[in-house]
Amino acid sequence: MEGAPTVRQVMNEGDSSLATELQEDVEENPSPTVEENNVVVKKQGPNLHNWSGDWSFWISSSTYKDRNEEYRRQFTHLPDTERLIADYACALQRDILLQGRLYLSENWLCFYSNIFRWETTISIALKNITFMTKEKTARLIPNAIQIVTESEKFFFTSFGARDRSYLSIFRLWQNVLLDKSLTRQEFWQLLQQNYGTELGLNAEEMENLSLSIEDVRPRSPGRSSLDDSGERDEKLSKSISFTSESISRVSETESFDGNSSKGGLGKEESQNEKQTKKSLLPTLEKKLTRVPSKSLDLNKNEYLSLEKSSTSDSVDEENVPEKDLHGRLFINRIFHISADRMFELLFTSSRFMQKFASSRNIIDVVSTPWTAELGGDQLRTMTYTIVLNSPLTGKCTAATEKQTLYKESREARFYMVDSEVLTHDVPYHDYFYTVDRYCIIRSSKQKCRLRVSTDLKYRKQPWGLVKSLIEKNSWGSLEDYFKHLESDLLIEESILNQAIEDPGKLTGLRRRRRTFNRTAETVPKLSSQHSSGDVGLGTKADITGKKKEMENYNITLIVVMSIFVLLLVLLNVTLFLKLSKIEHAAQSFYRLRLQEEKSLNLASDVVSRAETIQNNKDQAHRLKGVLRDSIVMLEQLKSSLIMLQKTFDLLNKNKTGMAVES
């Protein structure tokens, strides 16, 4: 942790005015005080906004009510305006592991543990956090988070979903550092993300609830929405250098964010900062008629709000509703392809999709034509087989994809398609499915914007380890899939524009795109692979041959395994027969021994004393004979030893005489 810049150091590098504001806030919230039981308690300064007291009327979930009441009861020193946003089961590493719960609100991070009436209470103001990282328990298990303040370090471990918990805390921490307050709509969106399945409301009621809460959102007197938006944009432009440096510092340990956060904040920030300064007034006027912009996003799409503020070369994008899914945004860029051409490439049996399916090892593709539904939407169904290389999922899996073209779509202007994908042969396939949303927005006659967002849906709730395994594999596969799709679309874009544009313009266009796009480094390699056009296109004969080879391989494997199992069964039968024979022989020998012992006992009772004396005499006579023979043998041995000794003496004398003569 040495060398990690503190909040004040980073703020001094960015803007002195914003640093002064945060410095005043830190002074209002003093450093933690350590009590006798090593409990850290921090006091909160005056809050920037006040929540209305009628918000709890809408909560129908007793679980959230219980959590919030428990939170208020355990942390009575916090202001009444603090509302619980999320809570996680974890443990604090001290001399021993203190198992408890971590509570997250808008301005505070609190921990409570009660082990045999030994209570531990910790309250950390988010603005006092200087650094936070993902850690590993015992340098092996990735389930820990370390929180660092100016005076202490807190090591929380045993998280069920470490990456999600870290992301939530990190976003609220950044929100506090930027001096942003949650709106009521944002607060309810966070509750939906953390307690959505336990609130007891359906999606339509949740949406109406968010809109009604937004309509009655309190405002401070004498302050218009234009002033509020202007102040927010001004603070955002002032602190843009601070956020970029802070996020880049933490992104080294944030493997869960992947390339989307790097592409959003790392490379587009300087461009959006300039555009925000140039078009500040038009942006503020738009905010008066639209829903307020989000100050944070727990779905890993930090650059969405910045992307929306940038101006495009057409007015069509502004009039199109952007409805991304709540998961992740994988593609968001403008292609030099018309909107209708993009739709044909992605949602028809085009040569592009055939090549793309072949490169992704997708075979046996069968699709139905677009059919109109009663509600005005259009439906298309696809079935195919995905050849897999993972040892955990098998050789291949069948998949069904249901594509829905919504009635809000306008030909050659705007297309919104939802793709629901179900895989049938992967582990835990009955627990989850994925939903992809494609938004094709016309920018100009030969340009369109493609936005692809994805969400992971659950049919039934799995337990923690299974859920983390599903999310890890699913998000990794989806990210690789859409990176490949974006790269192939760039190649197709260059092929389509090659006949229209001059070579010089095309070279300049590629050069500019290479410096802007996060996936442009992979484009030259892919273009060299697909430069021949139809080289990667697999014919039906090739697909059939691959399928037959796979079937033959499976049959051969089954035959070999059957023979092996049969041999094992025969070996077990042989061993069983031998073991039974050995057991029978042992029982026979035991019975014979018992009979001999019984006969000896009976003989000893019948034999008379005279016979016993005679036997004793006979034994004594035999012993005398043995002793006599032993004595004779000892005498012979003695004579032999004497002769041997004489022989050795004679040899020694001869050797001594020879030595003297020499």
From Swiss-Prot:
Record's compositionally biased regions (Basic and acidic residues): 265-276
Molecular function in Gene Ontology: cholesterol binding; cholesterol transfer activity
Domain GRAM: 69-136
Gene Ontology CC: endoplasmic reticulum membrane; endoplasmic reticulum-plasma membrane contact site; plasma membrane
Annotated region described as Disordered, given as residue ranges: 1-34, 212-237, 250-284
Keyword Phosphoprotein part of the UniProt annotation: no
Domain (VASt) ranges: 326-497
Keywords, ordered alphabetically: Cell membrane, Endoplasmic reticulum, Lipid transport, Lipid-binding, Membrane, Transmembrane, Transmembrane helix, Transport
Subcellular location: Endoplasmic reticulum membrane; Cell membrane
Family annotation (InterPro entries): Cholesterol_transport, GRAM, PH-like_dom_sf, VASt
Protein name per the record: Protein Aster-C
Origin species: Pongo abelii
